[in-house]
Amino acid sequence: GLYADKLAHDYGFGKRYTLIPFKGLYLKYTKNKTDVKMNIYPVPNLKNPFLGVHYTETVDGDIKIGPTAIPAFWRENYDMSHGFSLTEFGEVIFYEAKLFLANSFNFRGLALEEMQKYNKDYFVSLAEKMVVSIDPKGFTDWTKPGIRAQLLDKEKLSLVQDFVIEGDQ
């Protein structure tokens, strides 16, 4: 979760890791629920840990596209004020700036690409590539965002692709 690293640190584990939050935005398709009846994923880019924009059918039958993987500025950055912490903001910005300047794992390109997804037309164009019969005007409403808790190895300046298991004897 969003505070797993802090919890681990409190118990003396995972000191070389910190969490970098990424915001996932979604757009709801409001035109016709039958236009897409299953989850549809793009071929993943193995150079980054994110799936890319994909179609999801929700439990109530709605269709949404997303998520983005936009670097968030604090752990609970669901909107511009929710859960704001100046200390957290400083920590997150420090590591995001470090990743951006060092361009570790092409973070700069990834961040700039993801920021483009704030543009609704661009965001929808990515989904259109997978389902050409979809009406782009049907994507009307932004839904509640999610925050991905992404672990960062502070020593290697790399994202951790899997779990880290540490413990005492």
What are these regions (language model features)?
Residues 1-86:
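Flavin-dependent oxidoreductases
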Residues 6, 89-96, 157-162:
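Short, functional N-terminal and low-complexity linear motifs
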Residues 10, 92, 126-130:
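Residues that form generic nucleotide/phosphate-binding pockets
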Residues 16-24, 28-32, 101-169:
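Flavin (FAD/FMN) cofactor-binding core of flavoprotein oxidoreductases
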Residues 63, 67-122:
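Dinucleotide-binding/catalytic capping subdomain of oxidoreductase cores
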